[in-house]
Design a protein with these regions (language model features):
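HIT superfamily nucleotide-processing domains
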Residues: 1-135
């Protein structure tokens, strides 16, 4: 059964896209822990990251790192946190979260952004990503 992420990949559902290549896509989480909270996912539908081939896992981590570097250029934060949980959506996804405290990684407090804020943020992070990955 297709997950919501598969529907984003197939463009049945829109997203605030940050980056994309032939294997992965990154987009803003619409229920973010902090401004810039992004999800990086493989385009193949795999439930658990342990089920990814080692090469695909390594490529996902590399892609996620590139996305995190772009986010760090745009969002003021102390660090970029990363988490693989996968309990809510049965599709491997890496949370890339700008953090200033441990609380930002707890998935309890959420922030609200409107469409205009999400759209502007996605464009800004995408520009930073594109600039860094155009070499």
């Amino acid at each position: 059964m297709a997950s919501i992420f598969s529907k984003i990949i197939s463009k049945e559902i829109p997203c605030y896209k940050i980056a994309e290549n032939k294997e992965f896509i990154a987009f803003l989480d619409i229920n973010p822990n902090s401004t810039g909270h992004t999800l990086c996912i493989p385009k193949i539908e795999v439930d658990d990251f342990l089920d990814l081939e080692k090469e695909s896992y390594n490529k996902l981590m590399s892609f996620s790192r590139d996305v995190a570097l772009a986010i760090k250029k745009v969002i003021p934060c102390k660090r970029i946190g990363m988490s693989l949980i996968g309990l809510e959506v049965p599709h491997v996804h890496v949370h890339i979260i700008p953090i200033s405290s441990m609380e930002d990684m707890q998935f309890v407090k959420k922030i609200k952004l409107n469409h205009k804020q999400f759209d502007s943020l996605a464009k800004e992070i995408n520009a930073a990503y594109s600039l860094s990955n155009s070499i």
